[in-house]
A protein has these predicted regions:
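Conserved beta-strand scaffold positions in the cores of enzyme catalytic domains, especially
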Residues: 86, 107, 127, 177-179, ...
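Flexible, charged surface loops at secondary-structure boundaries
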Residues: 55-57, 97-104, 121-123
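Hydrophobic residues on the short alpha-helix immediately C-terminal to a glycine-rich phosphate/catalytic loop
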Residues: 77-78, 196
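Glycine-rich phosphate-binding P-loop
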Residues: 63-75
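Residue-level preference for the first positions of well-ordered beta-strands
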Residues: 60-62, 104-109, 177-178
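PAPS-dependent sulfotransferase catalytic domain
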Residues: 111-207, 221-223
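Conserved substrate/cofactor phosphate-moiety recognition/catalytic segment
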Residues: 80-114
Length: 270
């Protein structure tokens, strides 16, 4: 046998061994996944706390809403429920299908541009939508953007978020949405917790108001009413945009001054 023939034979044997190892790895992984799914313990762990038609699937909950509307606070407080995993990073709703967790309830908070895909949220995914008085949202700053602009949420961003919500309601008219007002979360956190618990079949582990890791502060409410700079900025927004804001306020029970500039004049008056 020549050296070339020997080399070819060795290469062939090596290729066969590699192929066999790959096949064994695939079979092992398939068997492991099958045992995990078929295991009574796995089924017990994944049994949701509410009837969703299939005990093998967890209870998936997506938190959406414009930035500075309480989405982060709501995300953190969801950890107050028992048997609940809260995914720490912001992510698209598709992340809910990628999580492999033993908890019965999975929670993901939207990423900054998730509003673009909100209308495609699966019907099987529960939705908590956070809202806040638009004037508070539009005059709130954020450490990540403070060096770039005075206020974190631009009028364009706020409008895109609201339009995305309207598109969702049009695309899925029968969808159940749990709206959480920031003002209610701060003012009556335990009442809001009870609403969330009833809506998704969750069991409180600790009361929202007693969570030491997430103290709730009321100082961020309606700051725009007490700040001439904020009122001046709000009065400079285009009338067409303010008309959309007024519609939002009417929908979610917020009052809106006819002209924010009038409050500026009143504050500056002797």
């Amino acid at each position: 046998m020549t050296v070339l023939q020997t080399t070819r034979k060795e290469a062939g044997l090596k290729g066969v061994r590699i192929f066999e190892s790959v096949v064994k790895a695939v079979i092992w992984r398939f068997a492991r996944e099958f045992r995990r799914i078929a295991s009574p313990l796995s089924s017990k762990r994944r049994k949701p706390t509410r009837a969703n038609g299939n005990a093998a699937f967890p209870n998936r909950i997506f938190i959406a809403g414009c930035a500075r509307s309480g989405t982060t606070l709501t995300q953190r407080l969801m950890g107050c429920f028992a048997d609940t995993f809260v995914h720490p990073p912001e992510a698209r709703h598709a992340m809910l299908n990628m999580l492999d967790r033993p908890e019965s309830n999975l929670v993901v908070k939207r990423a900054s541009r998730s509003y673009a895909h909100l209308a495609k949220l699966p019907a099987s995914t529960g939705l908590i939508y956070c809202v806040r008085h638009p004037f508070d949202v539009l005059t709130s700053s954020h450490p990540q953007t403070r060096a770039l602009r005075r206020f974190h949420v631009t009028a364009e961003r706020w409008l895109a978020e609201y339009d995305a919500l309207l598109q969702l309601k049009k695309a899925q008219p029968d969808r159940q949405v749990l709206y959480v007002r920031y003002e209610d979360m701060v003012g009556e956190p335990d009442v809001v917790q009870d609403r969330i618990a009833r809506s998704f079949g969750l069991a409180p582990r600790i009361r929202f108001s007693e969570d030491p890791a997430n103290p709730i502060r009321k100082t961020s409410l309606r700051k725009w009413e007490r700040n001439a700079e904020f009122l001046t900025y709000l009065s400079s927004l285009p009338p067409a945009f303010l008309a959309r804001v007024e519609r939002f306020c009417g929908e979610f029970g917020y009052d809106m001054p006819a002209n924010p500039g009038d409050k500026v004049a009143n504050r500056l008056a002797p």
